[in-house]
């Protein structure tokens, strides 16, 4: 039998393993996250001026995604909680002066829910408004303590019909609907967002299903969780990003919705006495 040599790992390998262990621990504790980018915007991702962080990673593959470069968690920039909170503190005075705050978007921020929760906790500790921009697909991952630190949810409802939702995202509709109901029962304020894509999400029965769902949310909790519905017209501004990541863009030849179509869809929501933008 040949001799078996039990060699001690080299110092370099040991150091690498220690660093990897420390990194994984930091991720689990929410001390380290993967960030795609950040920006200061006004009246887009919530009220007032917002410091919006786009976290990397998403479980959906929406056909109309304008940020496909956020899909992969490893592609983001490793960012410490301290780096994020330092920037928040730097802009806090401006954000407060405009009645704005901090928004976490993506990607899907709930894929990094521990990191996101730590950020929201810091915001609340210094009196800043918080908003979560999410599909709601991973809503079951977060507990009530997480939601206690969220002042507004921008809930992206991609479709009202399961088959259309599956076609658009590659996933199931039910988790999003359940998360919306949970928010409504808690009384968490919501802006419902709906991306209108001709020949994909514009069918009358699909819009009716979304509108019925949103109306049903108003019968839960305090009856006033949904503050507005935003109809977002499809656009082609994300085309270059699809090309940059080497993915064929399935909606390359799709045109934005006409004014007539936009008004028809807005009218379907207004018919249920919902505030529509």
Labelled PLM ranges:
Residues 1-42, 198-277:
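Auxiliary Fe-S-binding modules of radical SAM enzymes
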Residues 69-73, 166-172, 246-254:
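Short glycine-enriched, charge-decorated loop/helix-capping segments at active-site entrances
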Residues 27-28, 44-47, 96, 146-147:
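Solvent-exposed alpha-helices and their adjacent loops that cap or buttress functional pockets
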Residues 24-31, 71-89:
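Non-heme iron-sulfur electron-transfer modules
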Residues 78, 170-173, 256-259:
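Short, conserved loop/turn and helix-capping segments at secondary-structure boundaries
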Residues 37-79:
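Canonical Radical SAM [4Fe-4S] cluster-binding loop centered on the CxxxCxxC motif
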Residues 85, 89-101, 105-106, 110-243:
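Conserved AdoMet/S-adenosylmethionine-binding subsite of the radical SAM
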């Amino acid at each position: 039998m040949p001799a078996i040599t039990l060699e001690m790992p080299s110092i370099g390998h040991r150091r690498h393993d220690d660093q990897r262990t420390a990194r994984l621990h930091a991720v689990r504790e929410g001390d380290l996250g993967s960030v795609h980018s950040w920006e200061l915007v006004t009246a887009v991702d919530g009220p007032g001026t917002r410091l919006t962080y786009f976290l990397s990673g998403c479980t959906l593959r929406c056909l109309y995604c304008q940020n496909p470069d956020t899909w992969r968690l490893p592609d983001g920039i490793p960012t410490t909680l301290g780096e994020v909170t330092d920037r928040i503190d730097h802009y806090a005075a401006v954000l407060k002066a405009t009645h704005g705050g901090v928004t976490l978007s993506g990607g899907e921020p709930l894929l990094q829910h521990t990191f996101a929760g730590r950020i929201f906790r810091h915001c609340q500790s210094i009196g800043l408004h918080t908003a979560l921009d999410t599909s709601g697909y991973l809503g079951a991952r977060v507990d009530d303590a997480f939601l206690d630190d969220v002042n507004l949810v921008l809930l992206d409802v991609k479709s009202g019909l399961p088959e259309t939702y599956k076609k658009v995202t590659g996933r199931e509709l039910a988790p999003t609907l359940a998360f919306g109901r949970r928010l409504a029962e808690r009384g968490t304020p919501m802006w419902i967002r709906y991306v209108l894509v001709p020949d994909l999400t514009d069918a009358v029965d699909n819009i009716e299903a979304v509108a019925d769902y949103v109306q049903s949310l108003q019968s839960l909790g305090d009856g006033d969780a949904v503050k507005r519905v935003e109809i977002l017209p499809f656009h082609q501004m994300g085309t270059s990003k699809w090309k940059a990541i080497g993915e064929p863009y399935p909606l390359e030849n799709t045109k934005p919705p006409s004014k007539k179509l936009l008004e028809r869809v807005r009218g379907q929501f207004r018919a249920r006495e919902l505030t529509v933008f």
